Amino acid sequence: MKRWQAFKTLGLFGANLLHLNWDNMTHFSSIVELQDIVAELAIFEQKLARFKQRLNLNVEQYQADHISLRCHDISVAERWRKGFLQCGSLMSESIINGRPICLFDLEHPITVLNWQIDCVELPYPGKKTYLHQGWEHVELVLPVAPEILSTAAKALLPQPLPTGFSVKESQPKGEQERLPNPTLAVTDGEITVKFHPFTLREIVKS
């Protein structure tokens, strides 16, 4: 529950009590189990900035819905899960493409470039092995109808794409989710930016 929601629910007296402890809530950067990805965040930001520059991608006006990790080691996934539960709450856990995908609602957002991101996606390992386990993509919300998501996202990209970049389209869907979630991803094989028409919170609530 975010601060304004808590104030509304608890009323003035309860909000005053809550305010006394709110600033003591744990930020992800102080969690022992997350120190590997805390240390990596600045590197990820630098790579993301270069990625945007190469594509001349001007997307700062769009909401960064979430940031996602990747890993192939189950022990790493479990450690990250334990860590995020100390600085947020589990919003959702769904089976998508045969593996669990966890979404964490953070009490304090993570700063990535000019975005404040308070949702982290943790996909559990599948069959792939990665050269690197850590931050993988940022997903942005394009506020358009689902049926034109692909066209709208491609309009933001240069044509043709620079060498080494590729585009992939998909439609991930959890077992209980009703909203369509068409997704377009552009990647250089290391960093990925994805676009979809709804926030993950909207999709989970559907």
PLM regions: where:
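Glyoxalase I/VOC metalloenzyme domain signal
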Residues: M25-D65, L69-S206
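Short hydrophobic targeting helices and cationic amphipathic motifs
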Residues: L17-L20
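Alpha-helical and His/Cys-centered functional microenvironments
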Residues: T9, D23
